[in-house]
């Protein structure tokens, strides 16, 4: 008889279960309290109950745990310095959506060579999240794959659904199940309406299918996530200007949704020129000083060293430099945080 299934797949390995990984890298009571508390602080900012600014900042993607921990240690000092004005959260992205092809992140390919040691990647991701949270720094990530969230979501304080997946029904269902606040990016073309639709969908209850923590395929009912919000990330042109923010708020108001959003300094808003993130920062700071309450948070891409590098077989990587989108360096990061904190002073 002719085979009619699995004609285009080859088995690589068995996947560890979320329970097994969590037993190897368990959450302590102090880390659990830290994650819970940081989520609550973020929720209050998104609801307008806390005038401080949510700042999600860090490397475009994680590829080197040592460099990531050095960055986290320096970021913790900035958290303490600016805690009265900023709620700083570290960007810890382990999955990378691709327009066509490319390295898909630490979880999929931790060795950067196409060997796809996913179990090792999951282990590295969970270990790093534990260490960063133990430092006292909350973590943020994009939820891209429908399964991998089961391995790390208990350590995430703020999540995103990316521009390429905001319109996806299964990602909206996943967002409705997540225990952290979730931001939805506008589409790659700049369309913010799809993000508003995603917020509305994720607030509702859904049925969806997923493996549970022990790997058993399960039918889940979600209760809905009341903390969905737009992330303005630009598109064919930037959308961080005051008129863009006002237009997005008008759409939110139309559907009786909270008129609070997050502005991404990178991606379409910097037109893929990473140093322009500083220009976006200046504009947003002025909007805050002018009395804008709609801007609840910002995102920025920064690392220890400026720019980006290519993965070249047989050649060592430059320590502390991105291998995906170019990032601001640490010195610029400190300047950016200082400017944001000074602008938020006007809210007090």
UniProtKB/Swiss-Prot annotation:
Highest taxon of the lineage: Bacteria
Substrates-to-products reaction catalysed: D-erythrose 4-phosphate + phosphoenolpyruvate + H2O = 7-phospho-2-dehydro-3-deoxy-D-arabino-heptonate + phosphate
Enzyme Commission code(s) on record: 2.5.1.54
Classification via Pfam families: DAHP_synth_1
Extent of the signal sequence: none
Top class in the EC scheme: transferase
PANTHER family (alphabetical): PHOSPHO-2-DEHYDRO-3-DEOXYHEPTONATE ALDOLASE DAHP SYNTHETASE, PHOSPHO-2-DEHYDRO-3-DEOXYHEPTONATE ALDOLASE, TRP-SENSITIVE
Protein's name in the database: Phospho-2-dehydro-3-deoxyheptonate aldolase, Trp-sensitive
Organism listed in the record: Salmonella typhi
Gene: aroH
């Amino acid at each position: 008889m002719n085979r009619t299934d699995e004609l285009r797949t080859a088995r690589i390995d068995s996947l560890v279960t979320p329970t097994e990984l969590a037993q190897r890298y368990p959450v302590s009571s102090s880390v659990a309290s830290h994650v819970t508390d940081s989520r609550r602080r973020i929720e209050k900012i998104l609801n307008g109950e806390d005038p401080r600014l949510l700042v999600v900042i860090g490397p475009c993607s994680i590829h080197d745990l040592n460099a990531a921990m050095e960055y986290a240690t320096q970021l913790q000092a900035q958290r303490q310095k600016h805690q009265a004005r900023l709620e700083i959260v570290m960007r810890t992205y382990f999955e990378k959506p691709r327009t066509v092809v490319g390295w898909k992140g630490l979880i999929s390919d931790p060795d950067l060579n196409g060997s796809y040691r996913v179990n090792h990647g999951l282990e590295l991701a969970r270990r790093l999240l534990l260490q960063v949270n133990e430092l006292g720094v909350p973590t943020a990530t994009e939820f891209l794959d429908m399964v991998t969230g089961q391995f790390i979501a208990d350590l995430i304080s703020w999540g995103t659904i990316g521009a390429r997946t905001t319109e996806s029904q299964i990602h909206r269902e996943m967002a409705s199940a997540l225990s952290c606040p979730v931001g939805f990016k506008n589409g790659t073309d700049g369309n913010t309406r799809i993000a508003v639709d995603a917020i509305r969908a994720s607030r509702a209850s859904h049925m969806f299918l997923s493996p549970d923590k022990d790997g058993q395929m399960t039918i889940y009912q979600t209760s809905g996530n009341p903390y969905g919000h737009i992330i303005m990330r630009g598109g064919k042109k930037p959308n961080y200007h005051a008129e863009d923010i006002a237009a997005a708020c008008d759409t939110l108001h139309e559907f009786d949704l909270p008129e609070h959003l997050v502005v991404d300094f990178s991606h379409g808003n910097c037109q893929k020129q990473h140093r322009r993130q500083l220009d976006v920062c200046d504009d947003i700071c002025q909007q805050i000083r002018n009395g804008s309450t709609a801007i609840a948070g910002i995102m920025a891409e920064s690392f220890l060293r400026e720019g980006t590098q290519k993965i070249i077989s047989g050649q060592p990587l430059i320590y502390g430099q991105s291998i995906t989108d170019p990032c601001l360096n640490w010195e610029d990061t400190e300047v950016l945080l200082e400017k944001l904190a000074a602008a938020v002073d006007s809210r007090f």
